[in-house]
Swiss-Prot record:
Residues 69-84, 282-296 have a biased composition (Polar residues). Residues 56-68 have a biased composition (Basic and acidic residues). Gene3D superfamilies: 1.20.5.4090. The keyword Coiled coil applies. Belongs to the LRRFIP family. Residues 56-112, 277-296 are annotated as: Disordered. It holds the Pfam family LRRFIP. It comes from the Eukaryota. GO terms for molecular function: LRR domain binding. Keywords: Coiled coil, Developmental protein, Wnt signaling pathway. One of its GO terms (biological process) is Wnt signaling pathway. May function as an activator of the canonical Wnt signaling pathway upstream of ctnnb1/beta-catenin. May be required for dorsal axis formation. This is Leucine-rich repeat flightless-interacting protein 2.
Length: 404
């Protein structure tokens, strides 16, 4: 998890999250600017409405005042016309009664005018309060509508993101299941190979074989050692190889081959010496038959010489027979060792191939495991980021609801 690939992925995720946060903050700033502009427009419209209402109220007041002044001026004009001498003389009683009624009416309009003005003031106050409350309700309604639209957009965006994250989660889950299935298959293969190696070791132990490491192939001392290069031989062959000295298997076999050549050369030399001695003995026999008339002293010397020659010949024959036996045993051992070396080299090559395949499978499994862990970490970071964003949006929503 501390790989450079995982670090690059985490930085990419952080950059993507920071870009999303910047985009969201930019959208929020634009929404706040639009809301402020709408509020300013509503305030301006409210001021214009209030000025218009005041103007209408002034016009209404002027109209009512004018109407009341006209109503107040009419009884006085009537009284003036009735007070003209000689106009309606026959109806003096009725005119007197009318004068008293006009006096009462002249007092009643003042009271009715004050009552009307008070009622008008109350109506105006109620009207103003109703207009203000209506404007406030209109503003609150527009704010709530805007908030509802914003929340709807946010909810739709969140639903789309959640659907996308659900799809990604399903894909990642399927990929994880596939990886687990592949891991189980590879684990089964690994168990089978381990069982095969165990059977091989049991076979080697059962037949009394010995594993000889072959660290430097082809007898190259300066060559780097090959990991896992081994050779399996019998115990007798192992003793023979130990007698050849230390070193790689090729070097030991080369030493045995050189010793074999030396022994063959010694045997040839001994055969030549034996032929020479046989020729000498034949010559001595011929000389002994020719010199039968020699003296007894010379005969004794010849007999001694012949005995020595026969003894040497017998010794050489024994050495030659022993060397031939050693040569045959060495040849048999070399042939057997060569066959075993061929077999064990093939077995070692197969084991190396199996081991290389196992190492490759192990490396591939480790890479897949690291990839799966990186993906899981990325998904956890994405999930945590989404949870934080969802909590933030819930907090904003509760704050908006509390402000309402």
């Amino acid at each position: 998890m501390g790989t450079p690939g995982s670090g690059r992925k985490r930085t990419q995720i952080k950059d993507r999250f920071s870009a999303e946060d910047e985009a969201l903050s930019h959208i929020a700033r634009e929404a706040e600017a639009r809301l402020a502009a709408k509020r300013a427009a509503r305030a301006e419209a409210r001021d214009i409405r209030m000025r218009e209402l005041e103007r209408q109220q002034k016009e209404l007041d002027e109209k009512i005042d004018k109407q009341f002044t006209e109503n107040y001026s009419r009884p006085s004009s009537r009284n003036a016309t009735s007070g003209i001498p000689g106009t309606f003389t026959p109806l003096s009683g009725s005119s007197s009664r009318r004068g008293s009624g006009d006096a009462n009416s002249s007092l009643d309009p003042d009271a009715s005018l004050s009552e009307l003005r008070e009622s008008l003031a109350e109506v105006e106050e109620k009207y103003k309060k109703a207009m203000v409350s209506n404007a406030q309700l209109d503003n609150e309604k527009s704010n709530l509508v805007y908030q509802v639209d914003t929340l709807k957009d946010v909810v739709e965006e969140m639903e789309e993101q959640m659907a996308e994250y659900h799809r990604e989660n399903e894909e990642k889950s399927k990929e994880l299941e596939r990886q687990k299935h592949n891991c189980s298959i590879l684990q089964h293969k690994l168990d089978e190979l381990k069982e095969g190696i165990q059977q091989r070791d049991e076979f080697i132990e059962k037949h009394g074989l010995v594993i000889i490491p072959d660290g430097t192939p082809n007898g190259d001392i300066n060559h780097e050692p090959v990991v896992g290069a081994i050779t399996v031989v019998s115990q007798e062959a192992a003793h023979v190889l130990e007698s050849a000295g230390e070193g790689p298997l090729d070097v030991r076999l080369r030493k045995l081959a050189e010793e074999k050549e030396e022994l063959v050369a010694q045997i040839r030399k001994l055969k030549l010496q034996l032929d020479d001695e046989r020729q000498r003995s034949a010559k001595n026999n011929s000389t002994t038959t020719d010199s039968t008339g020699l003296e007894n002293g010379s005969d004794l010397q010849l007999i001694e010489m012949q005995r020595d020659a026969n003894r040497q010949i017998s010794e050489y024959k024994f050495k030659i027979s022993k060397a031939e036996q050693d040569m045959t045993t060495l040849e048999q051992n070399v042939m057997r060792l060569e066959g075993q070396v061929v077999r064990y080299k093939s077995a070692a090559e197969n084991a190396e191939k199996v081991e290389d395949e196992l190492k490759a499978e192990k490396r591939r499994l480790q890479r897949e495991l690291r990839t799966a862990l990186d993906k899981m970490e990325e998904m956890e970071m994405t999930n945590n980021h989404l949870v934080k964003r969802l909590e933030k949006m819930k907090a904003n929503r509760t704050a908006l609801l509390s402000q309402q």
